[in-house]
């Protein structure tokens, strides 16, 4: 249990806590996504791309099979009508 919690905490810091990372993602994905577009995040993990894509105005389908990551996604985006969280694996 401790190692799983540590892994999620590490991912949150790595993907949401690095200064400038979100800004760089907005710059990159802003070249491709426009408000109202639909984007699929297959393997959404802890939602760093979901966050960036929503900021750009895209509707997001976040596919994630891992229960711990699903909890994070639901916590961050569960009430956002522009995000559909799909608790499945794709392959």
Language-model-detected regions and their locations in the chain:
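Phosphate/nucleotide-binding beta-alpha loop and adjacent structural elements of enzyme active sites
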Residues: 1-91
């Amino acid at each position: 249990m401790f190692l799983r919690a540590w892994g999620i905490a590490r991912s949150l810091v790595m993907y949401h806590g690095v200064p400038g990372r979100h800004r760089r993602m907005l710059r990159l994905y802003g070249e491709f996504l426009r408000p109202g577009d639909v984007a699929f995040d297959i393997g959404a993990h802890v939602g760093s791309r979901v966050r960036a894509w929503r900021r750009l105005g895209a509707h997001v389908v976040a596919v994630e099979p891992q229960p711990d990551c699903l909890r994070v996604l639901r916590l961050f985006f569960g009430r956002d009508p522009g995000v559909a969280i799909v608790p499945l694996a794709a392959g």
